Curated annotation (Swiss-Prot):
<dbReference type="GO" id="GO:0005737">
    <property type="term" value="C:cytoplasm"/>
</dbReference>
<dbReference type="GO" id="GO:0051287">
    <property type="term" value="F:NAD binding"/>
</dbReference>
<dbReference type="InterPro" id="IPR050446">
    <property type="entry name" value="FAD-oxidoreductase/Apoptosis"/>
</dbReference>
<comment type="similarity">
    <text>Belongs to the FAD-dependent oxidoreductase family.</text>
</comment>
<keyword id="KW-0521">NADP</keyword>
<dbReference type="InterPro" id="IPR016156">
    <property type="entry name" value="FAD/NAD-linked_Rdtase_dimer_sf"/>
</dbReference>
<comment type="subunit">
    <text>Monomer. Carbazole 1,9a-dioxygenase complex consists of a terminal oxygenase component CarAa, a ferredoxin reductase component fdr and a ferredoxin component CarAc.</text>
</comment>
<keyword id="KW-0560">Oxidoreductase</keyword>
<dbReference type="GO" id="GO:0004324">
    <property type="term" value="F:ferredoxin-NADP+ reductase activity"/>
</dbReference>
<dbReference type="GO" id="GO:0051537">
    <property type="term" value="F:2 iron, 2 sulfur cluster binding"/>
</dbReference>
<dbReference type="Pfam" id="PF14759">
    <property type="entry name" value="Reductase_C"/>
</dbReference>
<dbReference type="GO" id="GO:0046232">
    <property type="term" value="P:carbazole catabolic process"/>
</dbReference>
<dbReference type="InterPro" id="IPR028202">
    <property type="entry name" value="Reductase_C"/>
</dbReference>
<dbReference type="GO" id="GO:0071949">
    <property type="term" value="F:FAD binding"/>
</dbReference>
<protein>
    <recommendedName>
        <fullName>Ferredoxin--NAD(P)(+) reductase fdr</fullName>
        <ecNumber>1.18.1.2</ecNumber>
        <ecNumber>1.18.1.3</ecNumber>
    </recommendedName>
</protein>
<feature type="binding site">
    <location>
        <begin position="149"/>
        <end position="177"/>
    </location>
    <ligand>
        <name>NAD(+)</name>
    </ligand>
</feature>
<dbReference type="GO" id="GO:0008860">
    <property type="term" value="F:ferredoxin-NAD+ reductase activity"/>
</dbReference>
Length: 414
């Protein structure tokens, strides 16, 4: 027997889930809406978890996407602190971990993902932390007053942002990256080397081409990180940032097609009728990526923009997702803004001088602009976004920061 029924059930109370509900109401949807969230909290912003929230610069109320009154006023039911264990697409039912079932007219799956865990010996010792949820960050922050030596595993954005906060707190920080540079999977060498130098200048010991063998501990708590080819590193606390695992199992079991994420079309539809997916757990063909291979993007922009498309589709309006991807990161006094996708780039060049702390890395593929990484260069970001959207031809003058990027936009035919 079904405990309750909603016209739209949204699984996931992150950016994508919140924006789907908001966009449904903005598009005139008058039916019943429920958001199911595995965490006990109202939808909140995720990026601050490894930055302002971890640094205690913002309290939790300041990172809420909307206050409780917003959801109540719009008659959006919140079912928090409960996970979906199973989906029956034939009966259009979701089954919750607490034993309840819920019927749906349309199901929107935006459950995100879980932090990828270490699988080495000692992974379960006390003092080993991940930064994926508010509870993760709260647990990490609670231990900081009693520690001095922090080891961060992973040189992606989460690891770098956490390193910046730890350095600000005066901790002795070591950052371990298995590849030959930080941000190797998402950025070119000029940006990687800039961030490596910046972190080292703030006292962070950045170790590249370094792999973790195991974690050592005493009395159930981590004391050292043992490396495959070097002496163990003393550690009072370990922060792990090595990616996420998409939360898609219930839908895959129900028959949804997946490849590193639930496969969706340009309107967010999965292979199961009346089931949509978006955000971190959805894989789509993106016009700014090469070879029409489905990709999965982990960003607020992607989740929010896909949510708007799905909401419009549910409301009966033809909508497709074609937004240019963008992303940002803050570390120390650095504001990085990226636009486009670097996948398959075959050339890069730098506008400006990294030594000044303000520059832009431009990425090209087949002679056209495909992405930019802008460091403290907002004007380049704003103007460069138009170049990426237009897939503009690369021109020699683009390397000179004296020439605004808007000068290289080819005028539209009259």
């Amino acid at each position: 027997m079904t405990d309750t029924h909603y016209d739209v059930v949204i699984v996931g109370a992150g950016h994508g889930g919140a924006q789907t509900a908001i966009a449904l109401r903005q598009n005139g949807f008058a039916g019943t809406i429920a958001i199911i969230g595995a965490e006990p909290d109202l939808p909140y912003e995720r990026p601050p978890l490894s930055k302002e929230y971890l640094a205690a610069e913002k309290g939790f109320e300041r990172i809420l996407i909307r206050p409780a009154s917003f959801w109540n006023d719009r008659h959006i039911a919140m079912h928090l602190g409960c996970a979906v264990e199973r989906v029956d697409p034939t009966q259009r039912l979701v089954f919750l971990a607490d034993g309840r079932s819920m019927g749906y007219g349309d199901l929107v799956w935006c459950a995100g993902g879980s932090a990828r865990r270490l699988d080495c010996t000692g992974h379960d010792l006390g003092g080993v932390h991940y930064v994926r949820t508010r509870a993760d960050t709260d647990a990490l922050a609670a231990e900081l007053p009693g520690v001095s030596k922090v080891v961060i595993i992973g040189g992606g954005y989460i690891g770098l942002e956490a390193a910046a906060v730890m350095a600000k707190f005066g901790k002795n920080v070591t950052l371990i990256e298995a590849l030959d540079r930080v941000l190797a999977r998402v950025a070119g060498e000029p940006l990687s080397r800039f961030f490596e130098e910046k972190h080292r200048s703030r006292g962070v010991d950045v170790r590249l081409r370094t792999k973790v063998g195991c974690l050592l501990g005493q009395d159930g708590r981590v004391t050292h990180v043992e490396l495959n080819d070097a002496d163990p590193i003393p550690a009072d606390l370990v922060i792990v940032g090595i990616g996420i695992i998409p939360a898609i199992s219930p839908l895959v079991v129900a028959g949804a097609k997946a490849s590193n994420g639930l496969l969706v079309d340009a309107s967010g539809r999965t292979s199961i009728p009346h089931v949509y997916a978006l955000g971190d757990c959805a894989a789509h063909v993106n016009s700014f990526a090469p070879n029409d291979i489905p990709i999965r993007l982990e960003s607020v922009q992607n989740a929010n923009d896909q949510a708007v498309v799905v909401a419009r589709t549910i409301c009966g309006t033809a909508a497709q997702y074609h937004a240019v991807p963008w992303f940002w990161s803050s570390q120390y006094d650095i504001r990085l803004q990226t636009v486009g996708l670097t996948a398959g780039y075959d050339q890069t060049f730098v506008r400006g001088d990294p030594a000044t702390g303000s520059f832009t890395v431009v990425y090209g593929r087949d002679g056209r602009v495909i992405a930019l990484d802008c460091v403290n260069a907002t004007k380049d970001y704003v103007q460069g976004k138009r170049l990426v959207e237009a897939k503009a031809l690369i021109e020699p003058g683009m390397t000179d920061p004296q020439y605004p990027l808007k000068n290289f936009m080819t005028p539209s035919p009259a």
